Amino acid sequence: MTQYTPMIQQYLKVKADYQDAFLFFRLGDFYEMFFEDAVKAAHELEITLTSRDGGSSERIPMCGVPYHAAKNYIEQLVEKGYKVAVCEQVEDPKTAKGVVRREVVQLITPGTMMEGRTIDEKENNFLAALTHFEDGSYALACNDLTTGQNTVTLLTGSVEDILLEVYATGSKEIVVDSSFSKDELNKLTETLKMTISYEDATAIPEGLEHLVKNVSQAKLIKAVGRLFNYVIRTQKRSLDHLQPVEIYYTNQFMKIDVHSKRNLELTETLRTKEKTGSLLWLLDKTKTAMGGRMLKQWMERPLIQKERIEERLEMVETFVNDYFLREDLKEKLKEVYDLERLAGKVAFGNVNARDLLQLRRSLLQVPAILEAISLLDNAYAARLIQGADPCESLTELLGRSIQENPPLSIKDGDIIKDGYNDKLDQYRYVSKNGKTWIAELEKRERDITGIKSLKIGYNRIFGYYIEVTKANLGALPEGRYERKQTLANAERFITDELKEKETLILEAEEKIVQLEYDLFTALREEVKVFIPKLQHLAKVISELDVLQSFATVSEEEQFVKPVLTTKREIFIKDGRHPVVEKVLNGKLYVPNDCIMPENMDVFLITGPNMSGKSTYMRQLALVTVMSQIGCFVPATEAVLPVFDQIFTRIGAADDLISGQSTFMVEMLEAKNAIANASERSLILFDEIGRGTSTYDGMALAQAIIEHIHDQIGAKTLFSTHYHELTVLEDSLDQLKNVHVSAIEENGKVVFLHKIQDGAADKSYGIHVAQLAELPDSLIARAKEVLAQLEGQEEIVIPKRVEVKEQEVIPEPVVVKEEPVAIEETKVDNEEESQLSFFGAEQSSKKQDKPVLDAKETAVLTQIKKIDLLDMTPLEAMNELYRLQKKLKKG
């Protein structure tokens, strides 16, 4: 390092502590980057890469950005998942001996960004910290630095389950300890696309102990400690706005895994990944940014406590029934700014005068809001506003201190009102009167000299001056003026009298700016005291905002208050898919009933493609989610149970599990439901088994239906193209066939989008192909093939067989290229239960059936004993490979 200049040595010393970040190194009016940072930053930011002499034989790569524009460049890097360490000059270059002392004042990362393009006002920006314990459990702690919110939970289950919970937080960055395995880190970076950071310290930092008073579990405290230590290390500033840690447990809320949230498009659409077109888009009528964030949190975690849901529903009903109360509340909420993030800016010391003016305007609305809610005859409302302080003393303080139209910068003056500080008033008097005196002097000098164009001006270099054009220089009295500057067409002068006043005025103006800055920073410290009260107010106002949002959308869209029942029954009259109905924008939407009494668990849904099966299934899920977040639902009448979980397999393969086929994803999601669902769950399976051969697909579909029916008892909607499965209604007493109706008119299919009892008579697949405008010749050929197939013997559905309780699917039937007889005594029974794809003529032929040898019989016996649903995909593949290898050995 000694071969470099002292400044480059200083850079390298600082950089050594921030190897995983870009180092923005302050040099005068620029932030400079050197070596690899410069090469990479020049590429990412599309700025010029240059070089400089650093003392070694080779020139050092260098690039830089102006300090006043650095914010935008930092945002660009953080948006791409990078970290940026900001290194400032911490001493005056004029007084420095040797190299100016520099220190990193902040490490900006994806999870610690406070403002910018990446921060959506209606979304949290969580930083996650994950701690792994020897017993296989994990603790997950999250912090939103912009609002001060902190949460922690204990997690058990597979690594995939843990990762899905991490993903559900929406965190862009996760903090782990250095013991995490490479495989675990790869899943975090590649699967979840998160920035990885490291922190080994887990003790709660000094001064933050009060935030974990309600946390007693050592595991949870370790996770929070890791999170807090990382935040302190990166931010290097006051964290007065951090809120007490909230403990939550996943079993306190309805569980909806990430796949299901995506399939249902709760907060973003599948295709565009945008809010528009999602359920959140429809329900979001909030007027405040913090209300929008709370709405999304509620949607991520619907309630499962019947009493809490009913409390919300009653408040929504109050707002629905009182139009004037609701409209008055909405008007006041429009004037309320983001109290949570304003409090965060106060704590961080980057709040400006305009922010405090917004805070005052927000607080002016609070007393009327609290008073209106206090008049309601509602225990939930009374409890909600209990302890809410309108902070009237803060409102008064800000009212007498901050100007009505302050500048953006707090270093330019003109931010403090007259009358707030005596010394400031004195300086302003001198400055104001001095300027008045100068205006009078200008008039007097014109009168004395008779030069009407004479003027008194000011610039930062020469101060005040008297300017006279060269044509009028002869009119100036001798000895009165002292030459100060010569211009092309004029001369500038000064007088003793003007010098004296200049000194007074400039001193006053300089002192005004400095005093205003000092007064503002002192005011900011006074506001800090109110941070806890502001955060409590923010929660109250956010909740009221979400409830009025529910009421507004419920009235606009003609939703109805659901009735919650402890029975396992669903009664939805004229239910609608809320988002599809909204997108149709006034066009006729066909409502559908969903009536499943306690003794009816499974709807087997058949019907044409494009007829609305998937929409009907999603509709039920969205109605239940809306009900359990406390919103009215799209129906004319709704009686619903409280579901503990929702499992879905609807739509295209999810890309969260990379490298898996559609069928594998289907099976993984089916396994998830089968392993975790209870009789209080809701299962929605759309076309399970379509990703494999017809034999396999139909067999698996039937086995899954039977298992759900017999072993789980969850309310289930199961759509299928296997019309042969509709005979299951005869053997499964809690299964009912329903179909989406369609009619044929003049050779064309008309979808009625109406759910009716019974099985569909045909699928109309060729008609759908016609709608897609496939070639006429292709359509004609498809009709010929269909006629031939329909003339053949139909597939026979196997009769139900008695299986052990732990088995999920019936015994597999081995199919080789040639029919095989295993044991003569079993052939008849197996033929009776086999699915036949052969025509009547072919299947009736008598064939000699070779018998399996001992090795093949042994392999078949092993296959029969395998419980696929207890195996991971990799284990199943390895087992298949082992058996195949065994058969191939001579």
Curated annotation (Swiss-Prot):
Listed InterPro entries: DNA_mismatch_repair_MutS, DNA_mismatch_repair_MutS-lik_N, DNA_mismatch_repair_MutS/MSH, DNA_mismatch_repair_MutS_C, DNA_mismatch_repair_MutS_clamp, DNA_mismatch_repair_MutS_core, DNA_mismatch_repair_MutS_N, DNA_mismatch_repair_MutS_sf
CC annotations in GO: cytosol
SMART domains in the record: MUTSac, MUTSd
One function term, GO molecular function aspect: ATP binding
Any one of the GO BP annotations: mismatch repair
Keywords, comma-separated and alphabetical: ATP-binding, DNA damage, DNA repair, DNA-binding, Nucleotide-binding
Gene3D superfamilies noted in UniProt: 1.10.1420.10, DNA repair protein MutS, domain I (3.40.1170.10), MutS, connector domain (3.30.420.110), P-loop containing nucleotide triphosphate hydrolases (3.40.50.300)
CDD domains the record matches: ABC_MutS1
Annotated positions binding ATP: G607, P608, N609, M610, S611, G612, K613, S614
Top-level taxon of the source organism: Bacteria
Functional note: This protein is involved in the repair of mismatches in DNA. It is possible that it carries out the mismatch recognition step. This protein has a weak ATPase activity.
NCBIfam families cross-referenced by the UniProt entry: mutS1 (TIGR01070), PRK05399.1 (NF003810)
Family stated for the protein in its record: Belongs to the DNA mismatch repair MutS family.
Name this protein carries in UniProt: DNA mismatch repair protein MutS
Native source species: Bacillus thuringiensis (strain Al Hakam)
